[in-house]
Amino acid sequence: MAKIILRHLIEIPVRYQEEFEARGLEDCRLDHALYALPGPTIVDLRKTRAAQSPPVDSAAETPPREGKSHFQILLDVVQFLPEDIIIQTFEGWLLIKAQHGTRMDEHGFISRSFTRQYKLPDGVEIKDLSAVLCHDGILVVEVKDPVGTK
């Protein structure tokens, strides 16, 4: 029986197709910044990537705006229904869990689950936390700046 290797879309994300044209595919294979969703440390990743190669689109890098959230997490949860996702806080930690039962996909049956933990900034209260599930399957969890601070 012949050995078959299935390549998933994560190896070649469509959102970075222009960058693949500017750089060789092998150069991008180990560039972990390509696989990160924007989050608290994405600014550092973008600076590192910009130093390594010329920017493809300068409009993609926007400075943080005054008065907006200072802590934001974006998760791709397109495979989960809103009722499959649990968001909790416990002793200064944000826990995001999701799990769905067995489903049929193009390759057979699959069940998915994940747990992510993030350390919340000091002084953050539960009432300052907001979560939105966007229509494209991105979960946005953010903590708004307290009034009077920058």
Curated annotation (Swiss-Prot):
Predominant subcellular localization, coarse grouping: cytoplasm
Compartments where located: Cytoplasm; Nucleus
Xref: Gene3D superfamilies: 2.60.40.790
Protein keywords: Cytoplasm, Disease variant, Neurodegeneration, Neuropathy, Nucleus, Stress response
InterPro entries: A-crystallin/Hsp20_dom, Alpha-crystallin/sHSP_animal, HSP20-like_chaperone, HSPB3
Domain sHSP: 47-150
GO-annotated cellular components: cytoplasm; nuclear speck; nucleus
Single GO biological process annotation from the record: response to unfolded protein
Associated disease: Neuronopathy, distal hereditary motor, autosomal dominant 4: A form of distal hereditary motor neuronopathy, a heterogeneous group of neuromuscular disorders caused by selective degeneration of motor neurons in the anterior horn of the spinal cord, without sensory deficit in the posterior horn. The overall clinical picture consists of a classical distal muscular atrophy syndrome in the legs without clinical sensory loss. The disease starts with weakness and wasting of distal muscles of the anterior tibial and peroneal compartments of the legs.
Stated family: Belongs to the small heat shock protein (HSP20) family.
Described purpose of this protein according to its UniProt entry: Inhibitor of actin polymerization.
UniProt-recorded name of the protein: Heat shock protein beta-3
Organism of provenance: Homo sapiens (Human)
